From Swiss-Prot:
Chain's role: One of the early assembly proteins it binds 23S rRNA. One of the proteins that surrounds the polypeptide exit tunnel on the outside of the ribosome. Forms the main docking site for trigger factor binding to the ribosome.
GO molecular function annotations of the record: rRNA binding; structural constituent of ribosome
Family listed: Belongs to the universal ribosomal protein uL23 family.
Record protein name field: Large ribosomal subunit protein uL23
UniProt key word Lipid biosynthesis: no
Domain of life according to the entry: Bacteria
Quaternary state and interactors: Part of the 50S ribosomal subunit. Contacts protein L29, and trigger factor when it is bound to the ribosome.
GO cellular component: ribonucleoprotein complex; ribosome
InterPro entries: Nucleotide-bd_a/b_plait_sf, Ribosomal_uL23-like, Ribosomal_uL23/eL15/eS24_sf
One of the Pfam families matching this protein, by short name: Ribosomal_L23
One biological process term in Gene Ontology: translation
Entry keywords, A to Z: Ribonucleoprotein, Ribosomal protein, RNA-binding, rRNA-binding
SUPFAM superfamilies the UniProt entry points to: Ribosomal proteins S24e, L23 and L15e
Protein source organism: Corynebacterium aurimucosum (strain ATCC 700975 / DSM 44827 / CIP 107346 / CN-1) (Corynebacterium nigricans)
Amino acid sequence: MAKLANPRDVIIAPVVSEKSYGLMEQNVYTFYVSTDSNKTQIKDAVEQIFGVKVASVNTVNRAGKRKRTRTGYGQRKSTKRAYVTLREGSDSIDVFGAGA
């Protein structure tokens, strides 16, 4: 298992969607993560950056959509998402706060 030097190389950005907002009420937070990171690296990065305890991490690889342009076809970038569940009694994460 390769360790990345900086935990901010693992966590790219929070996912902004209706589903991710709904999951926040259940202590599940969604992040775009590096495609070559694993669940252990994601867990360590979230615990270091936000100072919380992680119960579990689920990941999803999403293929980029094929899009048509005037000159032919292209493809959006493929992404990896991580659904991070916090432990019971753990503080919530302010992912959209100004202090980040």
